[in-house]
Protein backbone atom coordinates (compact mmCIF):
# COMPACT_ATOMS: atom_id res chain seq x y z
CA UNK A 1 0.00 0.00 0.00
CA UNK A 2 1.16 3.52 -0.77
CA UNK A 3 2.58 5.35 2.23
CA UNK A 4 0.60 8.45 1.26
CA UNK A 5 -2.65 6.50 0.89
CA UNK A 6 -2.26 4.93 4.35
CA UNK A 7 -3.10 8.25 6.00
CA UNK A 8 -6.84 9.00 5.92
CA UNK A 9 -8.19 12.41 4.89
CA UNK A 10 -10.01 14.03 7.81
CA UNK A 11 -13.16 15.91 6.84
CA UNK A 12 -13.50 19.23 8.70
CA UNK A 13 -16.91 20.50 9.83
CA UNK A 14 -18.96 21.86 6.95
CA UNK A 15 -17.33 19.67 4.27
CA UNK A 16 -19.58 17.13 2.57
CA UNK A 17 -18.44 14.27 0.30
CA UNK A 18 -20.66 12.42 -2.21
CA UNK A 19 -19.92 9.37 -4.35
CA UNK A 20 -21.64 8.60 -7.65
CA UNK A 21 -19.89 5.62 -9.21
CA UNK A 22 -16.32 6.76 -9.88
CA UNK A 23 -17.28 10.44 -9.48
CA UNK A 24 -16.30 12.03 -6.14
CA UNK A 25 -17.77 15.42 -5.20
CA UNK A 26 -16.50 17.58 -2.32
CA UNK A 27 -18.70 20.45 -1.17
CA UNK A 28 -17.70 23.10 1.36
CA UNK A 29 -18.21 26.71 2.38
CA UNK A 30 -16.19 28.08 -0.56
CA UNK A 31 -17.65 25.89 -3.32
CA UNK A 32 -17.74 22.44 -4.90
CA UNK A 33 -15.01 20.40 -6.61
CA UNK A 34 -15.31 17.09 -8.49
CA UNK A 35 -12.85 14.32 -9.30
CA UNK A 36 -13.02 11.19 -11.45
CA UNK A 37 -11.51 8.45 -9.27
CA UNK A 38 -9.39 5.86 -11.07
CA UNK A 39 -11.08 2.46 -11.35
CA UNK A 40 -8.26 0.73 -9.43
CA UNK A 41 -8.86 2.89 -6.31
CA UNK A 42 -11.58 2.24 -3.74
CA UNK A 43 -12.71 5.19 -1.59
CA UNK A 44 -14.57 4.60 1.68
CA UNK A 45 -15.90 7.03 4.27
CA UNK A 46 -15.97 6.10 7.95
CA UNK A 47 -16.40 8.33 11.00
CA UNK A 48 -15.54 11.61 9.27
CA UNK A 49 -12.50 10.24 7.44
CA UNK A 50 -11.89 9.16 3.85
CA UNK A 51 -9.74 6.08 3.26
CA UNK A 52 -8.11 5.08 -0.03
CA UNK A 53 -7.28 1.46 -0.88
CA UNK A 54 -5.88 -0.06 -4.09
CA UNK A 55 -8.36 -2.67 -5.40
CA UNK A 56 -5.52 -4.96 -6.50
CA UNK A 57 -1.98 -4.99 -5.16
CA UNK A 58 -0.05 -4.00 -8.30
CA UNK A 59 2.28 -1.01 -8.39
CA UNK A 60 0.02 1.09 -10.66
CA UNK A 61 -2.99 0.72 -8.34
CA UNK A 62 -0.95 1.58 -5.24
CA UNK A 63 0.47 4.66 -6.95
CA UNK A 64 -3.02 5.79 -8.03
CA UNK A 65 -4.32 5.34 -4.46
CA UNK A 66 -1.65 7.73 -3.16
CA UNK A 67 -2.27 10.21 -5.98
CA UNK A 68 -6.03 10.14 -5.41
CA UNK A 69 -5.55 10.68 -1.67
CA UNK A 70 -3.34 13.74 -2.33
CA UNK A 71 -5.84 15.19 -4.84
CA UNK A 72 -8.82 14.68 -2.51
CA UNK A 73 -6.88 16.19 0.41
CA UNK A 74 -6.23 19.29 -1.73
CA UNK A 75 -9.92 19.42 -2.68
CA UNK A 76 -11.00 19.26 0.99
CA UNK A 77 -8.50 21.97 1.92
CA UNK A 78 -9.61 24.10 -1.05
CA UNK A 79 -13.36 24.06 -0.32
CA UNK A 80 -12.77 24.76 3.38
CA UNK A 81 -9.87 27.27 3.38
CA UNK A 82 -8.99 28.01 -0.25
CA UNK A 83 -5.58 28.50 -1.85
CA UNK A 84 -3.63 31.61 -2.73
CA UNK A 85 -0.41 32.42 -4.55
CA UNK A 86 1.37 35.76 -4.31
CA UNK A 87 3.35 37.27 -7.20
CA UNK A 88 5.64 40.29 -7.17
CA UNK A 89 6.55 42.57 -10.07
CA UNK A 90 10.15 43.79 -9.91
CA UNK A 91 11.23 46.45 -12.41
CA UNK A 92 10.83 50.13 -13.23
CA UNK A 93 7.32 50.80 -14.55
CA UNK A 94 6.05 47.26 -13.95
CA UNK A 95 2.45 47.52 -12.71
CA UNK A 96 -0.58 45.29 -12.24
CA UNK A 97 -4.24 46.22 -11.91
CA UNK A 98 -7.18 43.84 -11.39
CA UNK A 99 -10.41 44.82 -13.13
CA UNK A 100 -13.09 42.17 -12.55
CA UNK A 101 -12.06 39.04 -14.45
CA UNK A 102 -9.21 40.79 -16.30
CA UNK A 103 -5.73 41.38 -14.93
CA UNK A 104 -4.02 44.32 -16.67
CA UNK A 105 -0.22 44.11 -16.63
CA UNK A 106 2.39 46.68 -17.71
CA UNK A 107 5.61 44.67 -18.03
CA UNK A 108 7.90 46.85 -20.12
CA UNK A 109 6.49 45.76 -23.48
CA UNK A 110 5.28 48.26 -26.07
CA UNK A 111 1.73 47.17 -25.20
CA UNK A 112 -0.15 46.32 -22.00
CA UNK A 113 -0.87 42.64 -21.33
CA UNK A 114 -4.49 41.76 -20.49
CA UNK A 115 -4.85 38.35 -18.84
CA UNK A 116 -8.37 36.89 -18.69
CA UNK A 117 -8.82 35.01 -15.39
CA UNK A 118 -10.53 31.60 -15.66
CA UNK A 119 -13.76 30.84 -13.78
CA UNK A 120 -13.20 30.14 -10.09
CA UNK A 121 -10.09 32.33 -9.84
CA UNK A 122 -9.93 35.85 -8.41
CA UNK A 123 -7.01 38.27 -8.47
CA UNK A 124 -6.35 41.12 -6.07
CA UNK A 125 -3.72 43.83 -6.32
CA UNK A 126 -2.94 45.11 -2.79
CA UNK A 127 -0.31 47.36 -4.40
CA UNK A 128 0.74 48.03 -8.00
CA UNK A 129 3.60 45.54 -7.74
CA UNK A 130 1.82 42.72 -5.86
CA UNK A 131 -0.69 40.24 -7.27
CA UNK A 132 -2.68 37.81 -5.10
CA UNK A 133 -4.25 34.85 -6.96
CA UNK A 134 -7.02 33.08 -5.00
CA UNK A 135 -9.23 30.07 -5.67
CA UNK A 136 -10.40 26.69 -4.38
CA UNK A 137 -8.63 24.52 -6.99
CA UNK A 138 -4.93 24.21 -6.07
CA UNK A 139 -3.89 23.10 -9.55
CA UNK A 140 -5.73 25.99 -11.25
CA UNK A 141 -4.32 28.61 -8.84
CA UNK A 142 -0.78 27.37 -9.55
CA UNK A 143 -1.43 27.21 -13.30
CA UNK A 144 -2.72 30.81 -13.44
CA UNK A 145 0.23 32.05 -11.36
CA UNK A 146 2.66 30.24 -13.68
CA UNK A 147 1.00 31.69 -16.81
CA UNK A 148 1.25 35.23 -15.40
CA UNK A 149 4.90 34.65 -14.45
CA UNK A 150 5.63 33.38 -17.98
CA UNK A 151 4.84 36.80 -19.48
CA UNK A 152 8.12 38.14 -17.99
CA UNK A 153 10.09 35.58 -15.91
CA UNK A 154 12.79 37.07 -13.65
CA UNK A 155 16.06 37.57 -15.49
CA UNK A 156 19.33 36.64 -13.76
CA UNK A 157 21.29 39.91 -14.19
CA UNK A 158 19.04 42.56 -12.65
CA UNK A 159 16.28 40.32 -11.27
CA UNK A 160 13.57 42.19 -13.19
CA UNK A 161 10.35 40.36 -14.00
CA UNK A 162 7.38 38.62 -12.41
CA UNK A 163 8.34 36.29 -9.56
CA UNK A 164 6.62 34.27 -6.87
CA UNK A 165 6.77 35.99 -3.47
CA UNK A 166 8.80 33.11 -2.00
CA UNK A 167 11.03 32.64 -5.07
CA UNK A 168 14.77 33.21 -4.81
CA UNK A 169 16.21 34.44 -8.11
CA UNK A 170 19.77 33.28 -8.74
CA UNK A 171 21.75 36.31 -9.85
CA UNK A 172 24.69 36.33 -12.26
CA UNK A 173 27.62 38.69 -12.30
CA UNK A 174 27.93 41.07 -15.26
CA UNK A 175 30.57 40.26 -17.85
CA UNK A 176 33.99 41.67 -16.96
CA UNK A 177 36.06 43.56 -19.51
From Swiss-Prot:
Superkingdom of origin: Bacteria
Q: What molecular function does GO assign, one term?
A: structural constituent of ribosome
Q: Does the keyword Transmembrane helix apply?
A: no
Q: Does the keyword rRNA-binding apply?
A: yes
Question: What InterPro entries does the record tag this protein with?
Answer: Ribosomal_uL6-like, Ribosomal_uL6-like_a/b-dom_sf, Ribosomal_uL6_a/b-dom, Ribosomal_uL6_bac-type, Ribosomal_uL6_CS
GO terms classed as biological process: cytoplasmic translation
Report keywords, A-Z.
Ribonucleoprotein, Ribosomal protein, RNA-binding, rRNA-binding
What GO CC terms are in its UniProt record?
cytosolic large ribosomal subunit
Family the entry assigns:
Belongs to the universal ribosomal protein uL6 family.
PANTHER family found in the cross-reference section = 60S/50S RIBOSOMAL PROTEIN L6/L9, LARGE RIBOSOMAL SUBUNIT PROTEIN UL6M
Query: Tell me, what does this protein do in biology?
Result: This protein binds to the 23S rRNA, and is important in its secondary structure. It is located near the subunit interface in the base of the L7/L12 stalk, and near the tRNA binding site of the peptidyltransferase center.
Q: Which HAMAP family match?
A: Ribosomal_uL6_B
State the oligomer form and interacting partners. Answer: Part of the 50S ribosomal subunit.
Tell me what this protein is called.
Large ribosomal subunit protein uL6
Q: What is the organism of origin for this protein?
A: Pseudomonas putida (strain W619)
What gene is this protein a product of? rplF
Amino acid sequence: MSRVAKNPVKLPAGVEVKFAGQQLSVKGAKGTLELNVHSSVEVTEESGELRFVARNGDQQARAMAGTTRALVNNMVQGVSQGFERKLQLVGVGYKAQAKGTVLNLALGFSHPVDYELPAGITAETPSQTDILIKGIDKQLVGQVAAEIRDFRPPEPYKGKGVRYADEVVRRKEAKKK
